[in-house]
């Protein structure tokens, strides 16, 4: 899996067949991805300023979109630990223009959660 951020999609590469396909479109300008301990895709979405998980049936579950009542900036890189904890970076560059999201006010400092 990898992101095509400006084209608002997540692509899937099949190493066996060499086929490239669209996994999710729109992706809400998703950037960083990882797998949780159950193999589900967890993504950082710049446009919606949230962390989501793609369920086995394709449904999207929002895991986080706020901290202390304030909207996240533009979650970027992410990792899931063996114990189920999720760590991610939250810089502001996805809300600074239209290239990777939409312009918006920053509510939180740049941080790692």
Residue ranges and their predicted role:
Residues 1-113:
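Sequence-structural signature of mature extracellular/luminal beta-sheet repeat domains
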């Amino acid at each position: 899996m990898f992101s095509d951020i400006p084209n608002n999609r997540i692509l899937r590469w099949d190493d066996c067949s060499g086929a490239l396909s669209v996994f999710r479109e729109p992706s809400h300008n998703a950037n960083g991805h990882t797998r949780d301990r159950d193999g589900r895709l967890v993504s950082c979405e710049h446009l919606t300023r949230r962390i989501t998980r793609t369920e086995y049936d394709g449904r999207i579950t929002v895991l986080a979109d706020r901290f202390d009542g304030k909207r996240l900036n533009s979650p970027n890189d992410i990792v899931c630990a063996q114990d189920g904890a999720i760590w991610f970076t939250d810089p502001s560059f996805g809300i600074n223009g239209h290239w990777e999201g939409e312009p918006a006010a920053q509510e939180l400092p740049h941080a790692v959660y």
